[in-house]
């Protein structure tokens, strides 16, 4: 309560000094009586000086009657007393007599012997139970925790305040604070008590409106936005509203106005506080926009260099405005210039915006720590290396290293290297944050910094009792200032403020409109104001500490035991006060840090709080934070709730007037200012947990009622928690017991056993007898692509005649743990369970399309329900891989030998049909498991879907082949005719990657007539439906497919199929993209000795760019015979050009096989290839315009064919050098050096030879045999006439043309 205190002028102090001098003179030579009289006189003078005229008159009478011996002393005393009586005495109102008077008196005394800690504790216990703990743990000695909790809603009891400040804090606490260098020093005088700051809109007596806009009077957007941001800070608005009495005094008396604002006038003068209060009232009372005249008219007094009409910085104006308000408040005191800095930092503005940073500098040599404290009113955060506000805070409070040898250590007494780190010693009530967006040269950093409406700074609190004794540092966003513009010298300022209703509004000068929370958090903010949120954090420590105390005392659930426990706590108030009033342990509950009490006691608090709920209104916070404990982890849930509260419920605690969603009515009563009716018997536990509504006689009833309130409040707060946390509780009731515990914050795994998987029944007969195999050591592949045959072999572990089965047991087990199923799929499981899993798991993905199982690092999309379910798992071992490959190669060898014997009967339709049928029978017999109907799956290899035939009959009969072909035509993916597209850059031959491509190799070695006759039996292969799987094959230079060329009538119906080595079936050149010269058997030395070069190519083709059937998985040479390819290629050229007598030989060019020489195809091949070479050169000349746009792949630059295989075949060959590397020849001799061949330079003109055209890109690969020695024949001229439109499609199947011979180069240069 206000106390009138007499304050004497300077003359009073001078008179007292004269009296003291007179006393000293008399005592030196005076008698005992004189000393006694002097003592009484001194006392009388002091009393008269402080008491009044009546007391001094009485003392004068006594002194005159008894001072007969010392007349001189008497005269001096009388004269001094008269001066004191005549002196003018002014009275000043003080809020606290103890702090203003008694604390000043303490400085006049010297403590002879400091009390022991036990005596201090005893003195504290004899006083108030909460005094010592509150005073010690308060904010720097003047922030009383007990008073702050009560004063937020009203006034505390005078007895508590007087006892706290007089007894214990005046003796030992202040001395401890002043003597401890690691603690913030206590100010000698507090101008404005911190607990008087009213936090939140509900603490005010008035109803706060949204606020009117402010008119821009000329580049004053910075002023308008700053004022709007300040007026929407509840603490500042409440304080300005409480200055009504000062506002009236400034208007009435010029002296008061002069004292408040410097003597400027009768209407407020220069008092900027009055100007702010008037402007605030104008915004609240007017519905239309106002002019902030009281502020911009005093702009020169606020800041001397600011001019009206000029653009200014909003943060600079904010700092000058707050400083001017502080100065105006200090000028209310006559001796404000004599106040020290700590006292000046206790003004209302500093109590609202001010805080203290603790700076710790640690020497790296002697580990000496130097601690200093720094006052701040805003934090300037560097955002150059941050994208979020939390990252900026982490960078600000992180430990930084001082420059080497630049810090002088107090311990080492020398310059050493050190580290420096900031922490929050005392956090401000309103935190002002400025993002450093502007540089010294005026540039602006316009990056987006994301922030949350609620932040927690508890993790940055200093490790000191005072810092730990603060409230949990949870802040909510109340206002911010944004800047729109690209530089400091231009732009526009706007403000966003939080109103009492809990909604945000955008204030753009005179325009005021609501804004959504998402828009607020996405703004390009410049200055942000966060205010302490006392409602939400206060409930959390009370509940948690309540649980800790009950656990430590054995779970008291009865009224009598609680009363006994409360009496014990009242007898030992020091410990309880430390725990209850100091959230020393509770600050660690917010954020990632754990409480000092440990997790063991915390894990059992849920049951205690739910059954014996003594918290009345705040138990819902505990219920939410303890909710994740049901899943087994409590700590994650606490931090999770905090994060969800910041993200999903930013406005919790803002609608303070209603208060129903956040606090129960009992707690609301305390918030309105009602203190405990029985403070003596009510202990600290009841004070903190029940918030002043403790009635020990009604404990049981309160517990029952609060348990119901707890459930209701839990339901109200459930939407605040994150969605996955809610799902975890709901799914826990549905799903079976999971094998591994899952944290609430962890994302749910794919499948995750959410629901029972539904398997797709392929046939009416189901055999749910299989069981999921146990996975012990999953195998890892060295090659990231699946083999074509390994899945077929592993999936066809059952007999080939078995019907498709679905195993629901294995499906459910695999779906419940998809990660185990994925690992299990990589092992060689039993036959039946493997098939069951391959059918059930993909079907589970069909029902859950968002769950894609990853195989080899690629996500697989589920197939539609109409198609066979796709398996995405590798289910074979390396041994199965080798066996399947060997079987396929054996079947290929047998077929090749068969084809060599029948090569003279290629135009006989009946013979070709029989050969084809026999070949199919051999293939199906050797790889019967490949055609098994139990593998009705289309495996996905590295993101490329592959198809597989579906057959239900036995694979040992010929009907299997025909039915498989029919099914393949239906699904556009037959295992005997179509091949899947292999990966774009396969690391190994494509024939092994694809299970169907191998079949196509054996089938597609037939010539055109063979296919025409075969189409009569297998009509499905020429179905006009374009196969979707083969659509991507033309982009793959390593495809192992070889589609048989259909008849001319049906040639354009299906999409183009690739040959075995990557070329199109309609092109004469067979190769893997490497154009070669004609290697005719025994034909003028053009191909007889090409084995050396081809073998060299075959040895290096395992790098992924060579042929698709050169090397096996173990790196050995395959057993595949290469003769049929040469014959087929020669025949295809002859057939397409009208030469049906004999097939021409052709180098396959892709390193597929060894060229065999035959005397029957020499002349035809020479004539054909010469013509084709001429046509190819003409086409290349026409494509020179697209040279630079279609450069070849740099990864294949080093691969090029030579002119001939080795020097044996032709004298024109220039690669007879031993150790010749055909892969390096193109790079070293042809393109770059270009010295040995004397060819044109790299960038040649169109007049140069067109044979160099194909060296630049892969687009023009003509799959033709170029003239090796300039010789050739006739025929095949029309080969390219109807293929020109398709040649640009052959980029994926081509490589580089062969280097021309020396004769060709000379001829081309001459031409």
Curated annotation (Swiss-Prot):
Start-end of Basic residues biased regions: 836-853, 896-905
Domain USP, chain residue ranges per copy: 212-533
Listed Low complexity bias regions: 120-134, 156-174, 560-572, 605-616, 660-716, 759-774, 795-826, 925-942, 950-979, 1037-1050, 1154-1176, 1204-1221
Acidic residues: bias regions: 910-920, 1006-1020
Keyword field: Hydrolase, Nucleus, Phosphoprotein, Protease, Thiol protease, Ubl conjugation pathway
Enzyme class, UniProt record, top EC level: hydrolase
Subcellular localization, as worded in the UniProt entry: Nucleus, Nucleolus
EC number: 3.4.19.12
Substrates-to-products reaction catalysed: Thiol-dependent hydrolysis of ester, thioester, amide, peptide and isopeptide bonds formed by the C-terminal Gly of ubiquitin (a 76-residue protein attached to proteins as an intracellular targeting signal)
GO molecular function: cysteine-type deubiquitinase activity
SUPFAM superfamilies reported in the protein's UniProt record: Cysteine proteinases
Active-site residues annotated for this sequence: 221, 492
Gly residues composition bias: residue spans: 1267-1276
Annotated spans, Disordered: 120-189, 546-575, 587-620, 640-1095, 1136-1311
Modified residues (Phosphothreonine): 767, 985, 1050
Comp. bias intervals (Pro residues): 980-989
InterPro entries named in the record: Papain-like_cys_pep_sf, Peptidase_C19, Peptidase_C19_UCH, USP_CS, USP_dom
Cellular component annotations (GO), alphabetically ordered: cytosol; nucleolus
Quaternary structure annotation from Swiss-Prot or TrEMBL: Interacts with atms/PAF1, but not with CycT.
Family indicated by similarity: Belongs to the peptidase C19 family.
Protein role: Required for maintaining multiple types of adult stem cells, including male and female germline, epithelial follicle cell and intestinal stem cells. May function as a transcriptional repressor by continually deubiquiting histone H2B at the promoters of genes critical for cellular differentiation, thereby preventing histone H3 'Lys-4' trimethylation (H3K4). Controls selective autophagy activation by ubiquitinated proteins.
Protein name per the record: Ubiquitin carboxyl-terminal hydrolase 36
Organism name: Drosophila willistoni (Fruit fly)
Gene, per the UniProt record: Usp36
